[in-house]
């Protein structure tokens, strides 16, 4: 956000709004302040967020803001487990019993592999190897595969065979409990 405001006459009047998909449904809004953002601009941004009926958090202007830093580490453990040889369905369903509204790969399908790859590459480049880039996600993007799940003829959600064919085939699978523990400790 700070880079985008460079050269503006009033960089103190710039904030970033980070919405979550689908915007009309997801209540969270991250408001990113730059080192130059003044309190009046932040207050205006908060009022806009209230008018939009959003729940706001103020974030430092940094790669990934708050949610993407947390989510990328969390999701990274799921994709790492899969890349190491854990079957996708075990990795994807390991957290069902702790109350998430959807599985990691259902979320991945909402966000899209291109966005997921961009976020992980950005965080890896700016924050280091703790934010690993999944070879599977890279292959999905390179081959144009857009979802982990598709709907069959009856409308039931099933694994996308094109995605399954591109998944890493490691030889060190984890159990569902191991996947859950590593994701929660990320």
Language-model features: locations:
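N-terminal glycine-rich phosphate-binding loop for ADP-containing cofactors
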Residues: 1-186
